[in-house]
UniProtKB/Swiss-Prot annotation:
It comes from Schizosaccharomyces pombe (strain 972 / ATCC 24843). One of its GO terms (cellular component) is spliceosomal complex. This is Pre-mRNA-splicing factor cwf11. Belongs to the CWF11 family. GO terms for molecular function: mRNA binding. Belongs to the 40S cdc5-associated complex (or cwf complex), a spliceosome sub-complex reminiscent of a late-stage spliceosome composed of the U2, U5 and U6 snRNAs and at least brr2, cdc5, cwf2/prp3, cwf3/syf1, cwf4/syf3, cwf5/ecm2, spp42/cwf6, cwf7/spf27, cwf8, cwf9, cwf10, cwf11, cwf12, prp45/cwf13, cwf14, cwf15, cwf16, cwf17, cwf18, cwf19, cwf20, cwf21, cwf22, cwf23, cwf24, cwf25, cwf26, cyp7/cwf27, cwf28, cwf29/ist3, lea1, msl1, prp5/cwf1, prp10, prp12/sap130, prp17, prp22, sap61, sap62, sap114, sap145, slu7, smb1, smd1, smd3, smf1, smg1 and syf2.
Amino acid sequence: MVLYKNKKKQIINYANSNWGQNEGVEFQETMLQCILEAVIVSKDAKQVLSLLHELKLFENFLWQRVNTEMSLNHINLTCMLLLYKSKYEYITWDLIDENRFQLFFEKVIEVSLSLNLSEVVYMIQFITLCFQFSNIEKLRKLVYQLTNISILNSLDNLDKVKYLLHDSSSLTKAFDSYKEKRPSIVEKFPLHNLLSRWIHSLLIKSISYAQTEKQEAKVTPLLAIINMSLVLLSAFPTRRFAHPVIEDSCFYTALRMSLYYDSNELFKKMTDDLNYVLKFPFDNTRGNEYEKEQKIRNDELVYYHLQLTLFSDFQKELGDLVFCTQTSLQQRQKLEEITSFLSFNSLKSLCSKCYLRTSFPEKYAIKVDFEFLKNVFINTYDRTRLVNDYDEIINFTLKDVLGERSVMDQENSLTNYFLLQNTAIQYLSISFFMRQQSKAYKKLLLRSLYAELLNFSEQYRRLSIKNATKNLTKDNFFSLNNFKVTSVAPPQIGQVLPQFVKCQMGLSRPGPFHSALRDLKNSIKSPFLCLIYISKDMEYKLLHGNALDPLEGVTDFTIATICNDDVGMFQSDMQSDSDNKSINVYLSPFYYHSLAGLGEYRPKQLKFNFALVLSPEANKYWLDLNILVSLLNRAKEFPKWFEDLFLGFGTPDICAFPNAGLNSIYARNLFNTVEQLQSVLPNCHVPSNLSTESLLIKFYTNQNKISADVTASDRHFLLPSNRLYTYNDKQLESILRGSQPGLTMVNGPTRCGKHVLVCKLLEVLQDTSPNDRTVVLSDSNFSMNTLFTLLEKARCFHQGHLLYLSDEGKDETLERYGTLSSWISKLPGLLREIGRLAASIQAPGSHDASPDTALYFRDAYIKRLWEKYLNTVDDKDSVDAYNRFPFHSYFGDKSKRPIETYNKDNFFDYATKLYGELEYMFQQLEEIRPFGLLRYYEDQELYALCQQSRIIGCTWTSLSTRLGTLKEKGFCFNNLIVMNSQNISESSITSILLSNCEPTGFDRLVLLGNQYLTSGNQDINNTSNGSLFKRLRYLKSRIIDLNTQYNVRESISSLCSSIYPLDIKTVDSSPNKRLDYGNSGFAHEVQFINVGAFKGSQETEPVSGYKQNLGEAEYAVALFQYMRMLGYPTNEIVICTLYESQVSLLNEIISVRCSHNSFFGQPAFVGTVEKLPSDKRVNFVIFTTVESKEASDHWNPKTFYKAFSACSYGLYVLCNRDLFRSTRGLEKLWNEIEKTPDKLLLTTGEIYPSSHKIGSSVETFEIENLLHLSNYVVEMTKKRLNTN
């Protein structure tokens, strides 16, 4: 820490001297050397790089001096800062000068060839970064020429190139074409020779480096080489040529690393990743997975190669063993026999000749020994283990958990390397992506399990000392009396694992355990348990604290699933006084199989003596992991157009309108005028005097232009379309494109009408394809509630075809439109109408008793009366049609407009509409009827999901718990609409798409998001599993940008536009024109307020990263109280901040000052900006920034944009205004900040909602400080009390 403080002071002095720009070259070089040493020596490189980023070393010095004479220190520091900025998205590639970047790129290539590997680590990482961002044009041109020339030239030097390429005609053609054109390329391109040696030279250097360097501090260069190789093996288009060049040398480098360093799990992870990429069965030119038959043929070739190698090179040592069959070579016993006859050198030679690709043991020997090579050889060719690799993903042992702990510990020693890495944005195949995400979730789960086991061990020790009893009880774990296996289902054909293992475990004093399971049942459908065994000889150590490791007492564990019936039993029998109760669980088949082995032994009694209820976080990881694994075998069921886009092949426009297909659509009340129609569809043919109420639009292409024939629609729709909203041109374009097959991406800020857009798109899809099923996905219930409120207002959707899967539970959603409970609750009202209808025609009997009797009444009476009416009415335009209508009595009482007021001469058309209402009522009864036959709510929901519903709205959380069951029951859909897609991970969307059982696949994918909002999804932030919206945007997919915000003040919109260059116009669509008036009691709608010191101090930081600002917290609560005194509703006010520690302080103050006072209440949200729901609509935001001395990483454009864009009418920022001048990305805010005073300015005589008109003169007064504001609020409260 002292070292960092000294270096920090020195770096700040350099910055104050303008980075020595007025000094000589020698001073500048010394300065760069000092700064570079500070980064390398520091234990937290991120902290130093963050300081350099804040001081603008890159912008003010390094980048300005990029030239051909740059020093090594200059190059390394530039690479470091580019890596840092890209990691934390502080860089805008479009703003970097292309010529200067090309000069720097070529200089890095040149220098990295001439220096040792240890000196060019950051240069290699910089080039790797360029590979990963090859979607950016200026990077793509440089990357393509480097990879194509370097890899193709390396292929020319390989003896085995013909053998490697003979199965791929496209690779052979590309290689031959390069050989022909190389002389002309060399002549025209001077850098050809430099680029052609680059990759091959680095790989050779890595092999040489691995053989000579033996210090752990030198491991980073090898890791950099392997990471670069992994990116080259996965990034399109480099992957089509990379394998033949990279695989041997790269794998050898990893092998040498693993042999030199003992027990390092990071090396095992790295070699396993590399092994997986190299061994994965796919066609390099396309990324398509091999068919099962082709995999079998390839497997046969592997054993043929082994058999040939043994016969040709090892006949002398093995004798008659070389004549064994390929089948016998796949047996472990035969492999053991072969290795026993080989010497160490012979076995080493055999492993080398066979190009082995396998995982390594967890502990690596210091030197290569015979047992190590023997294990490598046998594990490669042993085929007695028939467990599929995707099943092995969910196999957990205690060794895995402890191994992950080792990785966590050792990652800290390699912080510099891991902080500066990005993730590749392209994948080899769909299943490769699924496996990669499975590994990421497994990593998160293992870390969560480790934390829970650690917590359990500590609680166990404390309770044991306190209670001194065997029946230990805690809310999250419970002791077991016994644990026995009750039934084992035999394996399926071709498998070795049991289908399931059902066990019974006896609980001691099950009260708290029931409570924990009940809470867990409310959050997920299938609660999971961690079964633990603590041996007797370890209890003493744990009780007396003699264990060296807190987990030393836990000697075995596995994960089990509680049977659903038992969970229901828990909830109904929680108050039981029984001392013992047994419950059933499903044990992990992997664990049981490992106990039983390959023999006949099948244990009946197991040793587990504790059951640990997993936390909701661990349950979520386990559930998501199981979903990913269960969908691996469906990885080929994507439509071809989306598979190509997902993997990064071809032009993204191929997947969009009109290339993905053209459909005719029905559009009702979509366009306001014919002129708007012609502006959105400039090449359309519109007949004269066309009404836009109901249109049929037929699209076609004419000379590469999209044209359309627009005619009035004469189609009869069951429900009318109401014109509730008007749509701007961008919204109309989104609706028209979204109704066509393929991908549609819509980007826009908050309050730009995305919910209204989706509502209208659903109506168009319903009218155009009534039988299509659409899933609408979002990241929050708030977003879904908003959408279904709009659907209810539209009144053009049949409620029986809507389904809202809410996370709020059955009881809470009884009255919510679209939920199953709400739909079923309509039954009594419909039956009452049936009773009234039967009475109006004097039909005897209780026809309103049930849906069955009502449907019988329809067939026996209503249909016959209508058929009789049709047959007896001769002239449909006469009064006779009115006189003979059989339902006068019913509609005379029911209709808002008396039936007698209609024109009797033209009554038949109206009679048809009235009968249509009766048919619709019976249709609803017919669709509700099946739910009465299903006993359980879960079965009713499953029926609605898989059979009846046409529009399904849900969050990923609510759908993920049902996904496994839905896949088995044939859940299918045609369209997927994802709202707030920047917050939903790729694996979530992929899982939903793969669970689709529609034979033709899905037709449309519509992604709506806001590219400037940071994701609140921690799974996206913690893993490489980013959002699909963001990745497709990187791949240059076409995006429609919405540019109109509704009911947002122009001053707030200007703040957002000053952070990001948004061309946004604001529209006031409120009925009372609220934007014309200010906020009651405030002189300004937006104000940045200098709070200043409170009690002599500003923010405090007792622990690093734990910052609090008492003055700002008190000011924020006082401002909230002031607004409440004026009558502002609590649900319109939000208090947000940058630090979780400040949230605790705010909650504490609110609890004391507001919670128990009916005058105040609590704000709608108190929390960090990161946790603020991106779609939460609030009118007023109080934002406390905490820091007043210097800005930290929290002061970044995305965080402030999210806070500003969350409000509509009022924004009050508590801050130190001067910090905005010096914070990168926020400097442009200063022009907006200066427009308002630095002290809070209030008005008098205004009570919410009445207010002054903006621009008019109003009496104001200034709040001097926090004490002044607090006293003013106290006086207002006293007056209010006296008034009451």
